[in-house]
């Protein structure tokens, strides 16, 4: 798999173009500011006088309605939540798409699953930082960047690569390294990682460990430290050095205990469940479920949020984070 760097990309394809960033959340703010600071012509499209309107203006952006931005721009970069994109696209963006324009995303969900079907003659690309928005912005300001992905679904103008690579350079991704992939691969692997490991798997593992210790009579504070708080230390070691060097940095007791017991926690059944989760992503079952959830105003999701908020580990964690001086990071 080829990795591109700053010297591989040029901004030339965007020099005379206008980029409309639709949305001003964490990624919208970071990506738009980075491209603006890279000398690109950026406008921000938002709901008139919405919560983000004044924030974007305060950051020095040329702010306009989504319709105005879509009409004005050559590249329309959609960074609003996945479940809102199709509706906004149909009513506020599609009427202003003309041949030669480029539709861009940072997640392939709506293109891959067919919720957005662009007209002929329009490029469809993706540029995705592999980091939260705050880090995208901070590392750019520090003179570096975060890794990212680019992909091309439709190259209607025969220069879609030049356009998306220039966007990646403008955001600062090529300072760290950019990998070219496909909408299918980006979407399916991203969803799987979130569900099985990063958001779903890890939180369930932490909860189970915490509850096991508390049910055995140990202090909830001790349980939190040992199953949640210290996780960051291990993840940071893996992030910086990989598995092998993480094992080198922990004690022999931790290494032996971890290596000999881990397969009893994540079993063959766990991997079978992961394969089923991946299959649900690949065949569209998860997508249908998520669409139905939106149709009932996220009733199930809201109920799950309430349950998570009432967990004992949340109450204990809030106290300990305050004690550790971490409350400012929340």
Curated annotation (Swiss-Prot):
Residues 1-181 form the KARI N-terminal Rossmann domain. Mg(2+) 2 binds at residues 190, 226, 230. It catalyses: (2R)-2,3-dihydroxy-3-methylbutanoate + NADP(+) = (2S)-2-acetolactate + NADPH + H(+); (2R,3R)-2,3-dihydroxy-3-methylpentanoate + NADP(+) = (S)-2-ethyl-2-hydroxy-3-oxobutanoate + NADPH + H(+). Binds 2 magnesium ions per subunit. GO terms for biological process: isoleucine biosynthetic process; L-valine biosynthetic process. Residues 182-327 form the KARI C-terminal knotted domain. Belongs to the ketol-acid reductoisomerase family. This is Ketol-acid reductoisomerase (NADP(+)). It comes from Methanococcus maripaludis (strain C5 / ATCC BAA-1333).
């Amino acid at each position: 798999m080829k990795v591109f760097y700053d010297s591989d990309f040029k901004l030339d394809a965007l020099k005379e173009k206008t980029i409309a960033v639709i949305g001003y959340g964490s990624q919208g703010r970071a990506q738009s500011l980075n491209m603006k600071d890279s000398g690109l012509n950026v406008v921000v499209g938002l709901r008139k006088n919405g919560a983000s309107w004044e924030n974007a203006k305060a950051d020095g952006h040329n702010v306009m309605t989504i319709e105005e931005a879509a009409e004005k721009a050559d590249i329309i970069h959609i960074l609003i939540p996945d479940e809102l994109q199709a509706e906004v696209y149909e009513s506020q963006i599609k009427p202003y798409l003309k041949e030669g324009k480029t539709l861009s995303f940072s997640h392939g969900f709506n293109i891959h699953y067919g919720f957005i079907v662009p007209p002929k003659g329009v490029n469809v690309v993706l540029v995705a930082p592999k980091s939260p928005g705050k880090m995208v912005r901070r590392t750019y300001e520090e003179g570096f960047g975060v890794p990212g992905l680019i992909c091309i679904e439709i190259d209607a103008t025969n220069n879609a690569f030049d356009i998306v690579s220039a966007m990646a350079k403008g955001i600062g991704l090529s300072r760290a390294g950019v990998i070219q992939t496909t909408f299918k691969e980006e979407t399916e692997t991203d969803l799987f990682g979130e569900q099985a490991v990063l958001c779903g798997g890890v939180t369930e593992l932490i909860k189970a460990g915490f509850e096991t210790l508390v049910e055995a009579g140990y202090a909830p504070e001790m349980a939190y430290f040992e199953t949640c708080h210290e996780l960051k230390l291990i993840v940071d070691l893996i992030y910086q050095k990989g598995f092998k060097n993480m094992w080198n940095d922990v004690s022999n007791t931790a290494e032996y205990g971890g290596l000999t017991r881990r397969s009893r926690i994540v079993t063959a059944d766990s991997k079978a469940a992961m394969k089923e989760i991946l299959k649900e992503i690949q065949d569209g079952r998860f997508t249908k479920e998520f669409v139905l959830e939106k149709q009932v105003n996220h009733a199930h999701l809201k109920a799950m949020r309430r349950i998570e908020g009432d967990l004992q580990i949340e109450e204990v964690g809030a106290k300990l984070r305050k004690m550790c001086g971490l409350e400012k990071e929340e």
